[in-house]
Amino acid sequence: MAVRDGVVAWLGSDDVGRAQFPDATVTDLDGAFVAPAFVDSHVHTTATGLALTGLDLRGATSLRHCLTLLREFAADHPDGVIWGHGWDETAWPERSAPSTADIDATIGPRLAYLSRVDVHSAVASTPLRHTAGIADGAPLIADAHHRVRRIAREQLTAGQRAQARTAALDAAAASGIVAVHECAGPQIGGLDDWHELRAHTHGVEVIGYWGEHVGTAAEAHDLIARTQARGLAGDLFVDGALGSRTAWLHDPYADAGPECAAPHGNSYLDVDAITAHLCACTEAGVTGGFHVIGDAAVTAVTAALQATVDRFGGPAVARCGHRLEHLEMVTEEQAAKLGSWGVIASMQPNFDALWGGPAGMYAERLGADRAAGLNRFALLASQGVPLAFGSDSPVTDMNPWATVRAATTHHTPGSAISARAAFAAATKGAWRAGGVRDGITGTLVPGAPASYAVWDADAFDVSAPTDAVQRWSTDPRSRVPVLPSLTDDLPRCRQTVHRGAVIHG
């Protein structure tokens, strides 16, 4: 492969390349695997960096272990707010989340914010709750959670926030990722964080989405002008998350006890509000979208999209590239409609890897039957819904090969897709979801941006998921590109290049 001015200039055999470009600087990759670089279609950059530089609770194996990690971190960091992330009580023997009393008993009168792994609920120390004006005992979900998180974030210095962003983007580059879709909004990090991130200099490209509701085309134009966002989409919340029991469901949570105040989860936007936003964005020619997980939330968004199509027509809606984040509970009928309207599904296969299956968190929250219908990648792809894959980091790690593997090994038979389709969703599909629709970005062909990663991989194959029909030839003479075997030993990133510039390695 020859690269000139950040663009792929030529591909072919080694001897022809050396003859055609005799004065080129030659890098011998010594058998390494080169592929288009990844794009993560859903991240929270500052929060990811804070998880990397702060207290990481994702490895906690019990409530006691979680509190031990908190105690040790507090001792090592005696000043400032404690920012922690990643606890998941569903994997603990106690099956009990940490409480404010637990936090106070562990660290005393310090400010501490500890978000659950899905970042849709949290626990905080009493001093932080009081600073945020949250009553004792009130659950930290929805607006209360956003208020506590905002107060905790305000305790961080500009230097700490910048350090966190650099750590997050460095981690992306080290994972073979050259671009991320930042899903920001007034409830996520606020405008200050948004503007600081946009001003942050790094080799990883940040494509920003701003999740704030608008009601008219004029409001959409104004908000795009003020934020310079790629679209008014991303984490504009229709509902919450299944782990926190805040995703909006038609039927109650299977494990909702009598103390559960909202057994059907939470609805943050109704059909009329969703329709108003989509109509405003469509009229303005702007990408709109939402965070949508529960089946009731998907029903509401589908109804709103139907109303938007009825008003503006299918082609006008399709031109905008509206996108839905997560889209975990979708029916066959809904998938067909979304495909016909060109709606993009920005999904996270590692959600199924972590929480799917008959003994997983999804089954605990929903029961086995409903849980088996989550994250239906094959259904959506079969109905023409464009897929874009990401991590929702810090909810899951930015590990794109693990993402590809998860999409091919879905817990539910019939929901997996091939490795090649999953790879496309994590590269070309994610570029397309970000508004880049030239047909070549995310590939390595002459004229495409030279954005690629170099990997050490132990073995290669061309394979379909075990429950899918083979859709391309495995004969080497067909010259179909192979992919690394996605066993326990995933490929290791040696170098990442974006538009011809080395950003890692």
Q: For each predicted feature, which ranges?
A:
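Histidine/acidic-residue-rich catalytic or RNA/ligand-binding cores of hydrolases
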Residues: 126, 190-193, 298-306, 355-362, ...
